[in-house]
Every structure is written in C-alpha cells, then in structure tokens.
Amino acid sequence: MKHTESLAAATGRLIHSDDSSATVEEVQGLYGPFTFPELLLQRLWAEQTFQVERLQSHSGETVKVSYPGRWNRLAGPDFRDARVTIDGVSKRGDIEVHLRETDWHAHGHSDNPAYANVILHVVLFPCEREVTATGGMGEIPIVSLLPLLWHDLEEYAADDAIATMAARPSERLLGEWMWLPVTEARERLQEMSRRRWESKVRYARLRIEKLGWAEACHHTALEILGYRFNRSGMLRIATRFPLAAWRAGAMDCDAVFEAERETGGWALQGVRPANHPLVRLRAYRGWIGAVGDWPERLRREGLDWPNWDATELTESAMEWRRRVGFKARWMGVMRAIGALDCVPRPRADNLWGDGLLPLLAGAGHLREEQAFDWWRRAWPGDQPDSVKKTLRSLGVASGQTHPLTWGDVQGLLWWRWDQARQATLGRT
C-alpha cells in the first residue's frame, strides 16, 4: 500500500477565506469528515514535521532544507528568508505554503510582486504540475508533503485540537459536563475513549504497514520520548538512524543531538532537565543496550497475554487492577522489553497507552477488545493539569475507589476533538 493511499482522503471540498491562511480542506476521517487547515500545514513546514530526507520537487530534484524560513503571519509569503538547496544549487528566498497547487492562482499570487522572491511552493496534496507558473516571474519548483508525513491527516488535526484544549483553564472544559450525573459522565467518557482507542489502533496499523513491525516500534518509542515539543526531532532521528544502527552499539547520542540542533530541530525552552532530548536519547540507548530486539520481545508478550474477562462498567478501575494484577503485568512487560529502568513514569505510562498497546492491537498480536481494557484502565500518564483537574472536578476520578485512568483522559480529549471537528464544519 502506498503511503498516500493510507492517509485520510480529501472529499474535494476546499473552503477558502479572505485570509488565505484560514483556508481549510474537508477530509473524510474515521468518524466522519473533518477539516485540515492551511495554518496547520504551515506549522508542519515550520517544524519540519515530515521525512525531510525524502523531500523532492515534482520534477524529481532533491530538495534539502537548511532553514525553513521565518514564519510570516502578515501579508506576503508564508516564510521569509528560507535557505534551501535544489538539485545541488543553493537558494535563499521566500516559501509559500498551500493545501493545493491551484491555491497559488486562487489567492492571486501570480502577478503580485510581493511573491517575486518565492523559491519553493510547498503544497499538501500532490498534483500533475511540475512547477508553478508565475506569470512574468518565472517558474517555482513544487514539493508535496502528503507522501512524506509521519501520521494520518486526522491524527495531525486531532493532536492540534487537543493541544489547544490542553492549554485552556479547567473551568472552560467543565461547562458541558457539569450537569451530568457521575455515572452518566463515566459512560460517556468510556464511549469517547473507545473512539480514541480505535483511532490510535488505526494510526498504529498504518505505521506498521508503512515501516514494518520493528521500525514502527522504534519510531513510536522515540517519538514518545520526545515528549510534546520534540516529537518531530526524535522522529527525524528515528528515520535517519533505524533500529539496526542503535543495536550495532555505535550511537553517539551527543553527536546526534548536536547535528539535530544545528538545523534548529529542538525546542529546548521550558523543557525540564529530565525531559531534555539528549537525556532521552541516552535513555533509549540504554534501553537498546538492555534488550536490542525489544520489538520482538513485545510481540511475544502480546501473544502470551493473559485472557481475562472484559471489565463491567460497574467494576471500578481499582477493582479491575487488583483482579487482573495490572501492576505486575505492566512491570513484567516493561522489564521484558528493557524499558523498565530506562523510561520513568509517568512517561512510561504514555509509552504504554500511546505506543505499546496500540501497536500490539494494530499488528494483531493482541486482540483489540482485550487490549482496550488494559488501555483504558491503565494509569493516566503524563497529562495536562487542566485535563486532570477537570476530571476530578466532575467526580469521575475520586480517591482510591475510582482513580484517574488513561481512558478517562483520552475520552475527554477525544470529546474535545469531536467538538472542534464539528464546529469547523458548522455542525454544532
């Protein structure tokens, strides 16, 4: 399966705005259509959140990005003073970003002298054109990012909406939930968490189809160790240095870190010392040193998973954890794959919920329904304070009997994504 075929499909409905950066594309997702904004594509370019090593123009020229440019949120090209090398020729100038190549003409750039210094036209969706014609200003090479993205379009859009929600005070998240009885709130969160789970399994399956089991595990682990702000840098490193390179034992984490920093690949401001990407790279090297074939060990753990009965809604998370021996199983899996002493909690809980279980279910090494129970009843992990405070204020998480769970958090996050999705489509 080609990567472009595995991504969410555009419906063909392009929604323009007077502000060109507010243009959005309606895309069909797992639970209905959603919108992918041009502004998000600009952010992907600014952060270089794609497989930069494979970047080529539509005419087949190799494109290397030394500096993606200064993000311009005012009139004119989207990025100023970028530095790129196209087919061995160094160029310095502006970059314009659109969802489709035809937006260049739709937005009236062809004869606008403000765009005379554009050296590269970045678009999301591939097209038949090799260059963008600019009237009297010559021709501009085109690059398409869709085939190079690490994730499904819906996953990028959902993460963007969820990050926006996480930055809000908890009081703003309570409004639509306060009137619900606690039991009903828990039922709704379980429904939303199941949707979140299904989407994560789908994303994991796409990654496995694209990279294979071992490399999908490798990419996922490094991405999670990048925390929120350095996921892209970690993914670039995972692409540049596959699992075999780490297993060979010659990884110089300091040199790898510095090489990525030279290209502006790290976001270090406000990062806690324990979460610093160099610290996490060294931790992953220790992990590989302990169990080099950890993806294979994980596969075996999935196939040998104990087959417990599914959770009843009336059974609390604490009761379920005691019944199935959750802590012992969690530690057993982490120890078997070599991560127990290398990935501290609560980030290890994110590895469990965002990585290990979706990967096992996506590959068919663990039944989805069985994995879902171990996923939603797990420890909550490293989550925004506003989300945790909201769930406690609702009474969903209360004391020892009903501790905060991974599923509670993921259910609330999915609800916010669904609200944002429908709002942008004018359906709320």
Segments and roles (model prediction):
Residues 23-63:
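Short Lys/Arg-enriched alpha/beta "domain-start" segment
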Residues 83-94:
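Active-site beta-strand-loop-beta-strand hairpin of nuclease catalytic cores
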Residues 122-243:
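Internal, well-ordered alpha/beta segment that forms a basic, Gly-enriched binding/recognition surface
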Residues 188-427:
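Hydrophobic, aromatic-lined core segments that form the binding pocket/scaffold
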Residues 92-100, 121-123:
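Active-site ExK catalytic segment of metal-dependent nucleases
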Residues 1-21:
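Intrinsically disordered, low-structural-confidence terminal and linker regions
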Residues 109-114, 120:
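Compact, well-ordered interaction domains used in eukaryotic information-processing assemblies
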